[in-house]
């Protein structure tokens, strides 16, 4: 039978085998048009550290949700996380993600946006498999939060407005905390436990983002995966950058470097040296240590209430995020 001119027959190659592998893991795929999911599949071919999946498993030691529901929730978070990365890389004009060229440099901006949008709705479709009637409302709530956070970060960059630390913290709670919270709120909705784990999740989300900001400017491993000091080239007001600018309000050098969105190696090295001269990396490390200590205290309180030993997996995640325990080069990036 000849291929239809309306429904072309696509070549079955390496990408198709990737989709089959993903499907075996329980991830939804689009059977009719493999090109629809190609950017998403490409990103999944270079998996990150999957810390969100690890956190879901760790919190489930307390919540005891049935495995089939956990798998569904992890699938939802995986789809949303990878979709958000596709969009982030376009908005930030990124060059590398996980050590390979970004998806839109391979498939084009339009197709990558469409693939990301499709993933949002594939994730939404998965909500039908959950028993909590509030799952859709939770999903909508946290996706709105995620876009609020992303919108504020983009606004600061485009208007060259340096936010306060308080404004930055609110942005992080929305942007980074959104998916962390979504996973745990969906878990809580499937659990018999009435204990609220969101405060600890919020601490972990903030810890993760500030650590990520630090790594972007200080980690050799991070540079290999995303490029040297990518946040400087993006003009991003990250945590150490905000502290550095506000440490010397009358000095416009760093602000002007961000304005240039420079890819020049020497300019970026100068920016890192300037940030270091204001004590901002030291300040950042102190904040990370403080958040890690607070998260450990929150976890200890939960273990005291729920029973010792349930927090072993969460403690392992905290060790991974702890700069002193893991070393500053440890990479937990997306």
Curated annotation (Swiss-Prot):
Isopentenyl diphosphate binds at residues 49, 52, 81, 98. Its cofactor is Mg(2+). Binds 3 Mg(2+) ions per subunit. Its EC number is 2.5.1.-, 2.5.1.1, 2.5.1.29, 2.5.1.10. Dimethylallyl diphosphate binds at residues 97, 175-176, 209, 216, 226, 236. Disruption phenotype: Simultaneous disruption of idtB, idtC, idtF and idtG eliminates the biosynthesis of the whole spectrum of indole-diterpenes reported to be produced by C.paspali, including paspaline, paxilline, paspalinine, paspalitrem A and paspalitrem B. GO terms for molecular function: (2E,6E)-farnesyl diphosphate synthase activity; dimethylallyltranstransferase activity; geranylgeranyl diphosphate synthase activity; metal ion binding. SUPFAM superfamilies: Terpenoid synthases. Mg(2+) 3 binds at residue 212. The keyword Glycoprotein does not apply. Pfam families: polyprenyl_synt. Mg(2+) 2 binds at residues 88, 92. It catalyses: isopentenyl diphosphate + dimethylallyl diphosphate = (2E)-geranyl diphosphate + diphosphate; isopentenyl diphosphate + (2E)-geranyl diphosphate = (2E,6E)-farnesyl diphosphate + diphosphate; isopentenyl diphosphate + (2E,6E)-farnesyl diphosphate = (2E,6E,10E)-geranylgeranyl diphosphate + diphosphate. This is Geranylgeranyl pyrophosphate synthase idtG. It comes from Claviceps paspali (Rye ergot fungus). The gene is idtG.
């Amino acid at each position: 039978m000849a291929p239809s001119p309306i429904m072309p027959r696509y070549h079955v190659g390496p990408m198709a085998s990737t989709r089959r592998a993903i499907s075996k893991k329980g991830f939804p795929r689009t059977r009719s048009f493999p090109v629809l999911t190609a950017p998403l599949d490409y990103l999944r071919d270079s998996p990150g550290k999957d810390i969100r999946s690890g956190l879901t498993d760790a919190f489930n030691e307390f919540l005891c949700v049935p495995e089939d529901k956990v798998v569904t929730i992890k699938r939802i978070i995986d789809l949303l996380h990878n979709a958000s990365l596709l969009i982030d890389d376009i908005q930030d004009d990124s060059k590398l993600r996980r050590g390979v060229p970004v998806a839109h440099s391979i498939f084009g901006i339009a197709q990558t946006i469409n693939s990301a949008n499709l993933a949002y709705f594939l994730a939404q479709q998965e909500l039908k498999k959950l028993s909590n009637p509030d799952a859709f409302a939770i999903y909508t709530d946290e996706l709105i939060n995620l876009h609020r956070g992303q919108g504020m970060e983009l606004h600061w960059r485009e208007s060259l407005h340096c936010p306060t630390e308080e404004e930055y913290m609110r942005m992080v709670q929305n942007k980074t905390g959104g998916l962390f919270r979504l996973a745990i709120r969906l878990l809580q909705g499937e659990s018999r436990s009435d204990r609220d784990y969101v405060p600890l999740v919020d601490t972990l989300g903030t810890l993760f983002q500030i650590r990520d900001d630090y790594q972007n400017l200080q980690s050799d491993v991070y540079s290999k995966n995303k490029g040297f000091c990518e946040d400087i080239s993006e003009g991003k007001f990250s945590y150490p950058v905000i502290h550095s600018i506000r440490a010397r309000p009358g000095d416009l050098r760093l602000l002007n470097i961000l304005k240039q969105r420079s890819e020049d190696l020497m300019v970026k090295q100068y920016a890192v040296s300037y940030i270091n001269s204001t004590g901002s990396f030291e300040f950042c490390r102190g904040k990370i240590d403080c958040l890690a200590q607070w998260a450990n205290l929150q976890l200890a309180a939960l273990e005291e209430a729920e029973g010792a030993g349930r927090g072993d997996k969460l403690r392992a995640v905290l060790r991974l995020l702890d700069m002193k325990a893991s070393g500053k080069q440890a990479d937990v990036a997306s």
